[in-house]
């Protein structure tokens, strides 16, 4: 019996030793995140998406705002700018009602909302009469303001009456909400009404309509000048005045306006940051001059109301 007890004790002792020697396998480890996933996560954490800055209004100003949007979003992580057209009067109405944060316009704010809005003049742009290109107006490179007024009021109906050949004139207007229409009408028509006819809601669509319509004429910001259209200079007492930057800056070419970005009250937050970016000397001197048709306000040697 004693021998049996000793044997059992030895067996238990041996089993314990064996059990102690069996080290449990290491717990499985999660695979480390890939470098690209980690970098992407860090970038997203560092650049949270912000509430978009909403802008509507002038199609004449849209090319400049789109250029600013592209540069700004590329250099300001998380920034988002949403731009739509519709005309200057729509932009003013939208910002006054709170539908958007910024209203773009070629014209000053009307008296009924002027007290609510803060004006940021971001550029100057010129306007010109532009026409469908053809043999009928090949020799018509310039018209006087008087001749333009006669065309757009409907008094002159054929290109032969202004130095061209026999071809009916088709006037295509911008819609009543257009700032381009308001600026051109105030300077050229002096308060007279445009002749009734076809209309287009935005400048881009108008360019295409002019290309397709024989004998057509309209008015556009120089930011929409197109080699497939005739851009008409002005005839003045001293000769022909081309719509160049130099002539606009000096005031020799009179058909121009300030480009406004209106906010309801003082700009703040993301909208303020975007407008401030457009007004920086760097943008005004290096980016703005590369966008066709626009001139920094600081380059103007003359001023005007509106």
Task: List each model region and its residues.
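Intrinsic disorder/low-complexity detector
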Residues: 7-8, 23
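C-terminal motif of bacterial Sec signal peptides marking the signal peptidase cleavage site
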Residues: 15-19
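Bacterial N-terminal signal peptides that target proteins for export
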Residues: 1-7
């Amino acid at each position: 019996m004693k021998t049996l007890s000793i044997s059992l004790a030895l067996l238990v002792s041996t089993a314990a030793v064996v059990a102690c020697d069996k080290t449990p396998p290491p717990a499985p480890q999660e695979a480390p995140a890939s470098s690209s996933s980690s970098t992407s996560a860090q970038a997203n954490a560092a650049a949270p998406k912000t509430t978009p800055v909403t802008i509507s209004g002038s199609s004449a100003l849209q090319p400049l705002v789109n250029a600013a949007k592209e540069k700004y979003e590329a250099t300001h992580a998380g920034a988002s700018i949403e731009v739509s057209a519709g005309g200057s009067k729509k932009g003013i109405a939208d910002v006054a009602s709170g539908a958007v944060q910024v209203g773009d316009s070629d014209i000053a704010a009307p008296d009924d909302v002027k007290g609510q809005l803060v004006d940021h003049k971001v550029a100057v742009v010129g306007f010109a009469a532009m026409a469908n290109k053809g043999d009928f107006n090949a020799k018509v490179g310039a018209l006087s303001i008087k001749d333009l007024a006669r065309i757009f009021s409907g008094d002159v109906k054929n290109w032969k009456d202004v130095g061209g050949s026999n071809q009916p004139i088709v006037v295509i207007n911008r819609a009543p909400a257009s700032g381009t229409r308001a600026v051109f009408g105030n300077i050229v028509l002096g308060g007279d009404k445009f002749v009734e006819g076809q209309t287009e809601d935005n400048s881009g669509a108008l360019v295409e309509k002019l290309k397709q319509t024989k004998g057509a004429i309209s008015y556009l910001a120089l930011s929409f000048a197109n080699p497939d259209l005739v851009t008409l200079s002005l005839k003045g007492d001293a000769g022909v005045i081309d719509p160049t930057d130099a002539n606009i800056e000096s005031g020799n070419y009179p058909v121009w306006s300030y480009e406004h970005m209106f906010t309801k009250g003082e700009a703040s937050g993301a909208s303020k940051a975007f407008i401030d970016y457009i007004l920086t000397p760097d943008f005004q001197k290096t980016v703005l001059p590369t966008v066709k048709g626009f001139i920094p306000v600081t380059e103007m040697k003359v001023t005007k109301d509106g």
